Amino acid sequence: MLQIELQKWIQRFSSTIRLFFRLLIRLKTIKVNTNNLVEQIYIVGPGSLNITLLTACFISMVFTMQIAKEFLYLDAASAIGAVIVIAFTRELSPVLTAVIIAGKIGSSFTAEIATMETTEQIDALYLLNTNPIDYLVFPKVASCFLMLPILSIISLTASIAISLFVAFVMYDIPSSVFLKSAFNALSISDFLICLEKSMFFAIIIGFISCQWGLTSNGGAKGVGNSTTSSVVTILFTVFITDFVLSYFMFQTTGSSIAQANNI
């Protein structure tokens, strides 16, 4: 049973890669449904803003409490802002946003397309001379690619603001000390890394969620299984991709805190 499931998963994942190249080949000739694209952009962007901000705020509160407490014990208050902002910019904001979108949007995309596949609506698109890649896949992938970096930046901004507030109110760390430490440690490349990671994650979420929906079978039960498997696969792939990107992006760089303090 496990072997059969593994074989099916490998087939689906390989078909996701093929879908990626099929879409690349069709980019120049693709027929974009503007209304559909705008609708998907709204679903991914403004439709996910509340949960993104809520998650960013509470995660930043907890993270700031843990970091500030330990660094104050080490008499390193001047490094608190740098550590928190670097962590959110390079890792936490893009990854947490991707996790939220995977759970909220990825599952929705898979369930929608899987239901269409089960009820033979995909076949109806072919009869209407409409390519499912143009009508279904491209708007969903494009909306993720456009909105996930924006959501990550919004999440990052909210996280920094909440961390600044918590550090000042709960631990009496002056805002000037926090911000000076943060801005001395940050560089433009850190923001670019945040955006680059978000773009990679957006592609993963878009293609896996769509392909898992297109390959769904087994009626209502199959829709549920495909949705669950889609989210698990997206998260698994996002975490592996994050590790690989971080390894190559930061392996040769020095300490940002040391550079900020001219050590």
UniProtKB/Swiss-Prot annotation:
Q: Report any Pfam family annotated for this entry.
A: MlaE
Q: What is its main location?
A: plastid
Topology in the membrane? Multi-pass membrane protein
Q: Where is the signal peptide?
A: none
Kindly list the GO CC terms recorded for this protein. ATP-binding cassette (ABC) transporter complex; chloroplast membrane
Localization in the cell = Plastid, Chloroplast membrane
**Where are its TM segments located?**
43-63, 70-89, 150-170, 188-208, 230-250
Name by which UniProt lists this protein: Probable ABC transporter permease protein ycf63
The taxonomy runs: Eukaryota, Rhodophyta, Bangiophyceae, Bangiales, Bangiaceae
From the UniProt record, report the name of the gene that encodes this protein. Answer: ycf63
